[in-house]
Regions:
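Short, solvent-exposed recognition patches
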Residues: 47-48, 65-196
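Intrinsically disordered, low-complexity regions
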Residues: 3, 28, 35, 122-124
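Amphipathic alpha-helical segments
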Residues: 52-70
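Generic detector of ordered secondary-structure context
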Residues: 49, 56-57, 82, 198, ...
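A short, solvent-exposed beta-edge/loop patch
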Residues: 2-3, 11-21, 133-244
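A generic secondary-structure signal marking the coil-to-beta-strand transition
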Residues: 62, 96, 202-204
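Alpha-helical transmembrane signal-anchor/signal-peptide segments
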Residues: 25-50
């Protein structure tokens, strides 16, 4: 019985995706983002200007220094032209870093894809997937449900020696007044929005990524949760239900 229910759900989601594609191409009204946008210059790997606005990721968090990171040519070629980006790397005094990235759709919903597609292309193997919650205190207390991926790869150090690396990758989806942890949930909410309101919800996916040595995954995740709790209220306007 469980398999039948799952099959019906997946069939409904597939039908919803087809329905979305047809409605999107018909030029539906585009909803507001659940993130703050700002005028800024974003560049590709060759330092060429590619955008003059983006997601307003904060420049200062804790005692980190930060700098914008490039939007890759692969992304610019693959994703729709009306995609909006946010990209920043935050460096800690201990030489570790956390990279934050946002991809925000425009009228073309295909900007939003499963982040799991990106990691294997960068040489990472996904070892563990789990849904976790991160407490956020502003503008009110709520729990942010996110997907946590623990990853691994082998890389070469400065001396050319092959060494094992671990990565912690955290992501979720956000639109105006809406949050989602799973890709299918986001698609379903988008479909309901089109049917009930006639508005194409403007979804984004937000990611945070850090690498570490094997055995340091829990410490790295703890650092990331504190960082996310501090940074999210500075650029994300959508929130979860208020905690009692």
């Amino acid at each position: 019985q469980g398999k039948i229910i799952l099959a019906v759900f997946l069939l409904l989601v597939a039908a919803a995706a087809l329905f979305l594609a047809r409605l999107s191409s018909a030029g539906q009204a585009l909803g507001q983002p659940g993130l703050r946008l700002a005028a800024m210059e974003l560049h590709n790997e060759d330092s060429q200007l590619v955008r003059t606005n983006g997601v307003a990721l904060p420049a200062q968090i804790f005692d980190c220094t930060s700098k914008p990171t490039p939007v890759t040519k692969l992304e610019l070629d693959w994703l729709p032209r009306d995609t909006t980006y946010g990209r920043r790397r935050y460096s800690f005094p201990d030489k570790t870093w956390i990279e934050s990235s946002v991809v925000l759709m425009g009228q073309d919903r295909t900007s939003i894809h499963k982040p799991e597609y990106c990691l294997p292309g960068q040489g990472f193997t996904i070892d563990l997937r789990e849904v976790v919650t991160i407490p956020i205190e502003r503008p009110h207390a709520y729990d942010l449900s996110v997907m946590k991926l623990t990853t691994s790869k082998r890389a070469r150090d400065r001396n050319g020696r092959e060494v094992p690396l671990r990565g912690v990758y955290i992501y979720w989806f956000v639109a105006d007044g809406k949050l989602a942890t799973h890709h299918l949930d986001r698609m379903w909410m988008m479909t309901k929005g089109l049917l009930s309101e006639g508005v194409l919800q403007r979804w984004a996916y937000v990611t945070y990524f850090a690498i570490c040595k094997p055995g340091d995954e829990d410490t790295t995740f703890d650092k990331m949760t504190k960082f996310i709790a501090e940074s999210v209220p500075k650029f994300q306007t959508a929130t979860g239900p208020r905690k009692n």
